[in-house]
């Protein structure tokens, strides 16, 4: 049975696009039923429309009184969601949603967490720090989402080597390729029921 997926995105949604392409190639036993975005002008919405995926705009302008994201939770519950994927989503997920969908929300982060994680570390800002500190390695992390920024259990990480000649933009491009690779891998693991939990401990079934 196909897994029901909802994607959250705020920008270009390249990871969203990558997952869609893998589904089209029958490499994922899943279906994306909804795109949630806080940004009505983001490119991810254009891609959702092309692929006949419903889009839901959720932000403080539309719902100024929904401080706990209860309206959003009600919307999600209509889709019998198996998995929520954050793909460059720039807003914090509420406690009500992270608790209801515990161990069912994944995020991709452009660093080797816990390094360069937390509030304020996202996108090019991460790569600028890596470049400024002259790090010779970086990478990407797929983790489960909890109530805080970038602190949930880590599912997958992949490291890459960096040279002194690579600036923040070059690092970003290199890391994005890794993001696409390991996010697909993580979603595949979930769809194939290889992820299990025992008393809060993450177990991977071979």
Language model regions located:
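One-carbon transfer enzymes
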Residues: 1-206
